[in-house]
Amino acid sequence: MRKAIIAGNWKMNKTVDEAVKVVEELKPLVKDATCDVVVCPTFVCLDAVKKATAGSNIKVAAQNMHFEESGAFTGEVSPGMLEAMGIEYVVLGHSERREYFNETDEAINKKVKAAFAHNITPIVCCGETLEQRESGVTNNFIACQIKVDIAGLTKEQAEKVVIAYEPIWAIGTGKTATKEQANETILAIRNVVVEMYGKEVADKVRIQYGGSVKPNTITEQMAMSDIDGALVGGASLKAEDFSGIVNY
């Protein structure tokens, strides 16, 4: 039985004080959650949020990282720096990183391997555009992403990967894939993992849905056979909203 994982991606929002305030409000609201609870603040808030979550059931993720250990990479953060801070997860390959910063699947794969080398669990994002969805190439496109993104891992690493399926057309648009569409695509993703690493590994991989997830949509999504959680955007910025999703 896969344990659900619900992560709040705060994107480029919240000062340090605002981030800590949300965490303090969130802690009592999610203390009895049956799923893994993760918040993903900006780099500048990571340390303060990590300290604020101490002793709680809330885990902390970075929103990105470089794959190199150190060096002349101005503006970047290394996996070793995150590990030293005690960060448990890192979001990799988000569609905004792919679109605005030209991240490739090959670079994402290097980051996935670097995360595991530093005891950080990657949350690997994939998803299609509306044009791809309407052209009927969703499954092929996402398979191409996943086959590169999580290539070359050990079986022990592969089963720990969290995959987030985020249809790009549903991010921040208010549109959402139907629960059937989401489950069908996530099942297709799981079948790609079967091809790569076998059924035993694929059955352990947790696959989230992301894309305008709200408290009023989460229950029906989580009732589906293959949806193991959510990567939440805007609705994770307020403790009340996010706890409503976590406590589905």
Swiss-Prot record:
It is an enzyme of class 5 (isomerase). It catalyses: D-glyceraldehyde 3-phosphate = dihydroxyacetone phosphate. GO terms for biological process: gluconeogenesis; glyceraldehyde-3-phosphate biosynthetic process; glycerol catabolic process; glycolytic process. Its main location: cytoplasm. The keyword S-adenosyl-L-methionine does not apply. Pfam families: TIM. It comes from the Bacteria. GO terms for molecular function: triose-phosphate isomerase activity. PANTHER family: TRIOSEPHOSPHATE ISOMERASE. This is Triosephosphate isomerase.
